[in-house]
Design a protein with these regions (language model features):
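Conserved glycine-rich cofactor-binding loop
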Residues: 12-13
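Conserved glycine-rich Rossmann-like NAD(P)H-binding loop of the short-chain dehydrogenase/reductase
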Residues: 26-41
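Rossmann-fold cofactor-recognition segment
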Residues: 46-64
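Conserved NAD(P)H cofactor-binding loop of Rossmann-fold oxidoreductase domains
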Residues: 83-90, 127, 268
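Catalytic loop of short-chain dehydrogenase/reductase
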Residues: 90-92, 122-196, 206-210
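Short, small/polar-rich loop/turn modules that mediate ligand/substrate recognition or access, typified
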Residues: 200, 258-260
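A conserved structural motif in NAD(P)-dependent oxidoreductases
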Residues: 232-243
């Protein structure tokens, strides 16, 4: 029987590890991230639980490295799931890196796996609740549609945030919102492409979950984190296992008619923020 492979980028991050634990119940997993030592630590943990695990260092902003990842995955077996969680936060990175990792990395991953994903396979790209924080502008859509396959994509996206360049935090935050909106739109642009291989593609937009990246925000800017928590109607942060459970459902046969959509899992934060609430 041919081995079934779930490829997970951000493989040593909080969400990546949780997803590997969940999908590893039914498939082998290939973890990708930039730090191979950390990947091997996760590999040891997963293998101790009986999950066949492979690792490969990969910078998702590098097309050649992503193509090598796809070729390696294809050599291992049928690539049934591609879960692209890799991303960087505007609290830790400046706007150029935010755009390269979150937007260009998504293009590289989607392009590389669109031609090898197995019949019935599913790709899930990770966006963010931040994609819903700003109203999508027609100018953004024009750029998304005209430059998605162009070397100019980075330049065009950076032009949108350049007016904020005198403030690194605001510039990075704007870049993050736009890049994550791009992830949703670009995933939807690929529905037909994946359907030709009888595969599906979706995106998910997590709100604030207790991952190492979010813990860094809590540690660096506790007042901002406290304000965010106040805006979440369920009254708590999300947990990585809640994302992994969602992913397990989305790649299952039970979700076979879900395609080309974004799933917002934010505890009600977006609704509370942008929709007038009864009783207010």
């Amino acid at each position: 029987m041919t081995r079934k492979i779930s490829v997970i980028t951000g493989g040593h991050g909080g969400m990546g590890k949780a997803i590997a634990l969940e999908l590893g119940k039914k498939t082998s997993v290939l973890l990708a991230d930039m730090n191979e030592d950390k990947l091997n630590d996760v590999k040891s943990n997963l293998e101790s639980l009986g999950i066949e695990t492979f690792v490969k260092a990969c910078d998702v902003t590098d097309k050649e490295q992503v193509q090598e990842l796809a070729s390696y995955a294809d050599s291992l077996g049928d690539v049934v799931n591609v879960i692209h969680t890799s991303g960087v936060s505007p609290t830790l990175c400046k706007a150029p890196q935010v755009i390269r990792v979150n937007a260009l990395g998504t293009v590289n991953m989607t392009d590389a796996f669109a031609s090898i994903i197995a019949d019935g396979g599913v790709m899930v790209n990770f966006s963010s609740v931040a994609a819903y924080q700003l109203e999508t502008q027609d100018e953004w859509i024009d750029i998304f549609e005209q430059y998605y396959d162009s070397d100019e994509l980075y330049d065009r996206l950076y032009e949108l945030v350049e007016p904020f360049a005198d403030n690194d935090f605001n510039c990075a935050g704007m870049a993050y919102c736009i890049a994550k909106r791009f992830v949703i739109y670009y995933s939807q642009m690929n529905v037909d492409r994946f359907a030709r291989r009888h595969a599906r593609i979706l995106s998910v937009s997590p709100g604030s979950h207790l991952t190492p990246m979010h813990q860094a925000l809590i540690d660096l800017q506790p007042e901002i984190a406290e304000g965010q928590l106040d805006d979440i109607p369920v009254g708590r942060w999300g947990h990585p296992y809640e994302i992994s459970s969602l992913i397990a459902y989305l790649v299952s046969e039970q979700a076979a008619f879900l395609n080309g959509i974004d799933i917002l899992q934010d505890g009600g934060q977006t609704a509370k923020t942008f929709v007038t609430q009864i009783g207010d």
